[in-house]
Amino acid sequence: MAVKIKLTRLGKIRNPQYRIVVADARTRRDGRSIEVIGRYHPKEEPSLIELNSERAQYWLGVGAQPTEPVLQLLKITGDWQKFKGLPGAEGTLKVKEPKPSKLDLFNAALAEAEGGPSNEATQPKKKKAPAKKAASDIEATADPAGNADKSEPAAEGEDATVAGATEG
């Protein structure tokens, strides 16, 4: 029986994801497989290539033929060089940088905050309008005895007569 190592397609329309499988050469692309030995996601950056190297070496050793795309993946991971006894068995696989854990991020932020808690405002204070301050100073100097209460109703009355004159 002729055995091939090939890709079976999974995923959405524009987001292909593949399984690297060992299957009979006569089966269709997504047909029954003998064994799944890895996966390949070409749309990720860098492309995700996971391959069980031990099982790939076994199947290559018993005569399984890789298809062209799988052969390229085997060369990237270094399994083809290892099988053939060529130099460069470490491969050229790019590895995605691991994400920092949330605990590490939290500890870093905590250390930064302890380093110098600032009492300064993030935005400068807005200055009050000088007209209000000047008006309150004038009232305080004009009537220090507290007669300001008597003068206010008179001012209100004047405003009322002026408003009444304009209405009529």
Curated annotation (Swiss-Prot):
GO annotation, cellular component aspect:
cytoplasm; small ribosomal subunit
Q: What is the lineage of its organism?
A: Bacteria, Bacillati, Actinomycetota, Actinomycetes, Mycobacteriales
SUPFAM superfamilies assigned: Ribosomal protein S16
GO BP term, pick one: translation
What Gene Ontology molecular-function terms does this entry list? structural constituent of ribosome
Q: Name one Pfam family in it.
A: Ribosomal_S16
Q: What is this protein called?
A: Small ribosomal subunit protein bS16
Which residues belong to the signal peptide in this entry?
A: none
Origin organism is Mycobacterium sp. (strain KMS)
Question: What does the sequence similarity comment in the record state about its family?
Answer: Belongs to the bacterial ribosomal protein bS16 family.
Q: NCBIfam families in the record, alphabetically?
A: PRK14520.1, S16
- Please give the superkingdom of this protein's source: Bacteria
